[in-house]
Regions:
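S-adenosylmethionine
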Residues: 1-189
Length: 189
C-alpha cells in the first residue's frame, strides 16, 4: 500500500497494524519525523519516503493507494470553530488543484484491480464528492466501489447515495459529535 500524504501517520499506523506493507510518502521532513516517531511508539513498521507525492516515481505499482489529501479541514469545525475564518477562496482553489494532482498521481501508481482511496476531513463537496465525480467522468478505467454500512460499524447514515463515506459533525451527537470526513473507494478496472 502506498500512503502518499502520510504524515503524521495515523492511517499509516492503522494499515501497518492490519498487516499491510506500507510505503509512507510525505513531502515534509518535520512531519515525516513525527510519522517515524509515531510508528516507533506503536512498534509498527513502514517504509518512509520524503518526497512530493505528485513527483514521486516508485519502481513498482501498488495494490492500493491511500490519499488522505490536504484540504480545508472544515470537518474539524466542532473542535476548531475558527476554521471558517482562517481559509480563503484562494486557499480552497489551491487545495482543489493539489487534490486533483494527487488523484491523478494515485491512479498512475495502481496495478489493474488496485484500489484508490481518497479522503479529506472537509465538509465541502468540492473537496470530496465533486472531485470524485470529475475523476470518474474523465477516467473511465476506474469505478466506484461502494462502502457498506457493515464496514463502518453499521452506521448507514455515514454512507451517501453514491456509496461514499460522508460523515458530518452532528453525527453521533449523543457521544459529543464527530469530525466531518469524506472517503471514496475506487477500483482500477
Amino acid at each position: 500500500v502506498a500512503d502518499i500524504c502520510a504524515a503524521p501517520g495515523g492511517k499509516t499506523a492503522q494499515l501497518a497494524n492490519a498487516g499491510a506493507d506500507v510505503i509512507a510518502v510525505d513531502r515534509s521532513p518535520s512531519r515525516t519525523k513525527r510519522l517515524e516517531q509515531n510508528l516507533n511508539r506503536l512498534d509498527l513498521k513502514a517504509d518512509i519516503v520524503i518526497a512530493d507525492a505528485t513527483e514521486w516515481e516508485p519502481n513498482k505499482k501498488f495494490d492500493a493507494v491511500l490519499i488522505d489529501s490536504p484540504c480545508s479541514a472544515t470537518g474539524t469545525i466542532r473542535r476548531h470553530p475558527d476554521i471558517l475564518y482562517s481559509k480563503t477562496t484562494n486557499d480552497l482553489a489551491k487545495l482543489l488543484k493539489l487534490q486533483w494532482k494527487l488523484l491523478l498521481t494515485g491512479a498512475q501508481l495502481l496495478k489493474p484491480g488496485g484500489k484508490l482511496i481518497f479522503c479529506t476531513c472537509s465538509m465541502q463537496t468540492e473537496e470530496g464528492e465533486q472531485q470524485i465525480e470529475k475523476f470518474l467522468k474523465l477516467n473511465r478505467s476506474f469505478e466506484r466501489q461502494p462502502i457498506s454500512k457493515e464496514e463502518v460499524g453499521g452506521y448507514s447514515c455515514f454512507i451517501n447515495e453514491k456509496g461514499d463515506l460522508r460523515i458530518l459533525p452532528f453525527f453521533l451527537k449523543e457521544l459529543g459529535g464527530i469530525d466531518g470526513f469524506f472517503a471514496s473507494r475506487l477500483i482500477c478496472k
